Regions:
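Short-chain dehydrogenase/reductase
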Residues: 9, 13, 70-71, 131
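Helix-loop-beta segment of a Rossmann-like dinucleotide-binding subdomain
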Residues: 1-7, 57-65, 118-128
């Protein structure tokens, strides 16, 4: 089972409600939000540094918990949220302050327990396949930070360590 609902928005409220009702009736969690684009952008940029750190740690959660990976990825996630909010012209989400080492530590312990499959194996296969997209996203955060004169030291260090760039 999925942990979060798929997010939907649109100009035709009745149509969006109909889609989400059909999905829920079929067992797929779905919800209506004011702007799915913003919601998805925030969830993506909060997750991406965890994926990059996991890759840097050999796709093992136990290895992510060693050294400063968790501190680095938490800082990168907060920076990415700030950058994304600036790009979209909205406020940072309420959960930004929660993106700290303890939260990502809990995620690193809970991911394999919560997923109905081996999360490490899945993440490695999926994100290796879309690795170029991951690198482009990280580069995009760095370019956005430069253009807006916003902090990106954690993103830059994580990117350098894992991708050498």
């Amino acid at each position: 089972p999925r942990l979060t609902a798929s997010k939907f928005s649109g100009a035709e409220a009745a149509r969006v409600r109909g889609v989400t009702q059909l999905l829920r009736a079929g067992g797929c969690p779905a919800s209506v939000v004011s702007d799915a684009r913003v919601s998805l952008a925030f969830s993506s940029c909060a997750m991406m540094p965890m994926v990059v750190a996991l890759e840097g740690a050999g796709w093992r959660f136990a290895s992510v918990r060693k050294g400063d990976w968790l501190t680095l990825l938490a800082g990168a996630a907060r920076e990415a949220l700030t950058l994304t909010a600036a790009e979209l012209g909205v406020s940072s989400p309420w959960f930004r302050p929660l993106l700290r080492r303890p939260l990502f530590t809990a995620i690193s312990y809970g991911a394999n327990w919560l997923a109905p499959f081996d999360a490490e194996v899945y993440l490695e296969h999926h994100f290796t396949k879309v690795g170029e997209q991951t690198r482009l996203m990280m580069q995009g955060y760095l370019e956005s930070a430069r253009a807006r004169s916003l902090p990106s030291a954690h993103i830059a260090e994580l990117n350098q360590r894992v991708f050498g760039g």
